[in-house]
Amino acid sequence: MENFDKTMKFNYDEIPKEDVKTVLQNVYHTLEERGYNPVNQIVGYLLSGDPAYIPRNNEARNQIRRIDRDDIMEELVSNYLQEKSN
């Protein structure tokens, strides 16, 4: 019988921050090209998880869906705070 009283730790390869940045830049530019307000659309996606906020053009929707929304928010907050501290 297995012991289920211990907390297991799951390790996975984290997505490099550069990949998150590259994807966000691509999504931003795609949204601009399509005539959308990129900030509003990305915020809508992050809050709702609904990929319909991101267009399929330039594979933007597929790219952003590969990254966990928490990782995207972490990257955005980290960059914002780093910029403010300089």
UniProtKB/Swiss-Prot annotation:
Domain of life according to the entry: Bacteria
InterPro entries cross-referenced by the UniProt entry: IreB
Record-stated family: Belongs to the UPF0297 family.
NCBIfam families according to UniProt: PRK05473.1 (NF003997)
Protein name: UPF0297 protein SSP1144
The organism of origin for this protein: Staphylococcus saprophyticus subsp. saprophyticus (strain ATCC 15305 / DSM 20229 / NCIMB 8711 / NCTC 7292 / S-41)
Species classification: Bacteria, Bacillati, Bacillota, Bacilli, Bacillales
